[in-house]
Regions:
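N-terminal structured subdomain of primase-like DNA metabolism proteins
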Residues: 1-98
Length: 98
């Protein structure tokens, strides 16, 4: 008896970070450079720069929009941008980065 199937890797945050950095993912989806300063929000109409990036005490990169209170990681940003749940966001990222 022969089984014909492929085992796909488990997609989680750790798996994604084995391949690219948080900065790479965040910059790709926000369309913004990851540096100090304020930027216009890519998620809503914004006439005054209100978005910044910062690192948490444990080193995670965070997107912070002072205009609407959004405070998310790169996965959270994808969830908000595409209006999907966590696992769907992981799948989108994995597919985009092949």
């Amino acid at each position: 008896m022969q089984l014909d199937f492929e085992i796909e890797p488990t997609i989680n945050k750790e798996y994604l970070l084995e391949h690219y950095t948080e900065e790479t993912y965040m910059s790709y989806y926000t369309g913004l450079p990851i540096k100090k300063g304020l930027f216009l929000s890519p998620l809503r109409e914004d006439h005054k720069p209100s978005v910044a990036f910062y690192r948490t005490p444990n080193g995670n990169l965070i997107y912070k929009d002072f205009g609407d209170g959004t405070h998310v990681s790169f996965i959270g940003f994808v969830m908000k941008k595409y209006m999907v749940r966590y696992y769907q966001a992981l799948q989108i990222i994995a597919e985009d980065f092949g």
